[in-house]
């Protein structure tokens, strides 16, 4: 059974991916992130969800930030 943090991570990652229209959503999985990074991911999630649209450079920066938060 998954922990509440894993479920929260999964939901946030899915929402970020949908908002950014990321094509390779399957590459980013909740299992790739430690529970210790949930605060950082929450901050990123809030930032992404507040914006209506993103420039290509912003999308790249967000993808890089997601990559840096992985285990």
Swiss-Prot record:
InterPro entries: UPF0435 (IPR009507). It comes from the Bacteria. Pfam families: DUF1128. Keywords: Phosphoprotein. The modification Phosphoserine is found at residue 57. HAMAP family: UPF0435 (MF_00829). Belongs to the UPF0435 family. This is UPF0435 protein YfkK. It comes from Bacillus subtilis (strain 168).
């Amino acid at each position: 059974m998954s922990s509440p943090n894993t479920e929260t991570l999964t939901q946030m990652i899915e929402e970020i991916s949908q908002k950014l229209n990321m094509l390779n959503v399957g590459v980013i999985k909740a299992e790739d992130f430690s529970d210790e990074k949930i605060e950082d991911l929450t901050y990123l999630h809030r930032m992404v969800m507040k914006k209506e649209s993103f420039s290509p450079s912003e999308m790249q920066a967000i993808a890089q930030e997601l990559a840096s938060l992985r285990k």
